[in-house]
Amino acid sequence: MLVLALVAGGAAYLLLRTHGSPQQTAASYLSDWQRGDYRAMNKVSVNVPHGGLATPLGQFAAQVGVRQLHLVLGRVTPDSAGAQARYTATADLASSHVWRYTGQLQLVKQNRAWWVSWSPSAIYPSLTTGQRFVLHAVWPARGQILGTGGTVLSSPATIAQSGSISLLTGNVVTATAAQAKALGAPYHKGDLIGEGGIEQAFQARLAGRPSLTIQIQGPGNHVAATAAHFPSVAGQPVQTSIDMRYQLAASHAVSTAKTSKPVDMVVLQPSTGRVLAVIERPGGFDRALSGIFPPGSTFKVVTASALTKKGLRPSSAVQCPPTVTIDGRTFHNFDNEQAGRTSLLNAFAISCNTTFAMLATQHLDGSSLASMAKTFGFNARPALGIPATLGHFKTPRQGVDLAADAFGQGTDLVNPLSQASVAAAIEDGTWRPPQLVTNPAPPQSAQPRKLDAGLLNTLRPMMRAVVTKGTAAGVGLPPGVYGKTGTAEYGSGANPPSHAWFIGYRGNLAFAVLVEGGGIGADASAPIANAFLRRV
């Protein structure tokens, strides 16, 4: 009988004893909160509001702008209601501030288990029912966007001198409700934010961090308590490579051009790849940096470079008939011009399409032309700090596709940024990825590519011949200019419209001018380059 009594007593103890401990329950609750597992939190809590803890804890995170929450359990002590567990919360906020505070959980024992007795004070000690968190941010002075020599590009005075600057800088606007929501706390409707260009791309750096007050407000917006206050951090400048001397010279050349067509122009420094000027008329979409256009005969710089690797030289004898048929497609020169038997230098200078179509199919294949295009930055990803693109080149098949690509009337696509970098590479001897924002400089995935000496010895005299006796000879360009004209047909029909190109360099300046739908490069684009060069 005694043995039976002892066994029965032991079974009753096992059934009636409390499972777990307040430490275990508090640790489980905090771990689940940190992971955002609100359902698991509901299972270890009592007095849970209707709908569970997802609503109040989600509201807390949204109101304060919590990006990440780290919770550490502290001391657990018994009290008259059960036990209290202290914890340390470290909240990384969307405002880039870090909020640390000490909270506490009330634990109770019910039904032989420990539970978190939930109330708003489990989120923050002084928070009560009906209250919410409100952020008050006061933004510091915004950082400036600078050109060389400390010129403030983002100032109204600078933009008034050259409206194209705003395509690079973007604008500062008051945030809409949707924009503020997208940026997250501490942004509110009406705050100043960047829209487009550098202002948007470097919003966090330029805006700095506001002085931030986290308040607890009750009904009627009554301030019940201040939970935290953080001082402001001033906005930092963004340095660019834009040089207003060249920007204004290019702006004047474009604004006075004798054409009503859209004009896009980029000026680079060959020795560094830095963008010195970007001009567009009219404004709107950033075509000079992000547009895509057929290159026309400016692509002959790439093709001639590939031919050089196959042993051709400026003096190499070539044919320049008015037309040539390759795989059933007939290619022609502008106005069906012809030069008969001539040199490669002369065919390049007068921009003979048929010469390059024939030479490409005779000496090159798709991979060799694609490899040379890659050397000049095609398909590379530029890191200007704002959206931009370089040339696009798909490896052509043999025959008609290769022939068309060879003189820029295939699937190859470019913009003034990419073509200015091609000209810059011939001047410097190294293709360099273009740079616009220099501090903080975005990481570059594209690397400089050194050109071979034989290539340079071929291309430089050929580009000089374009100016002295070729398609640009009648423009009256100043001494020391090397260039290449381009007339790039687009659309369809017997006489399709064409874009007008002129790319080139003089000294440590490289440029590309595109007149969209402008016709002949020598007539429309080269005079703009001439006007620019004569002002610098």
PLM-predicted stretches and their roles:
Residues A225, V263-G291, A306-G517, G521:
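Beta-lactam-recognizing serine transpeptidase/beta-lactamase-like catalytic domain environment
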Residues R142, L289-F299:
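Gly/Ser-rich catalytic serine loop of serine hydrolases
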Residues L30-Q34, V254-K258, G377:
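Short regulatory alpha-helical segment in sensory/regulatory domains of signaling proteins that mediates
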Residues T18-S28, R35-R86:
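Short solvent-exposed beta->alpha transition segments
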Residues G296-S305, S316:
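Active/ligand-binding-proximal structured segments within catalytic/core domains
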Residues M1-S31:
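Short, low-complexity N-terminal intrinsically disordered segments enriched in polar/charged residues
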Residues G65-D264, H499:
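Extracytoplasmic/periplasmic proteins that interact with beta-lactams or build/remodel peptidoglycan
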Residues Q23-S31, R39, K43, S166, ...:
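Solvent-exposed, polar/charged alpha-helical surfaces in well-ordered, non-transmembrane soluble domains
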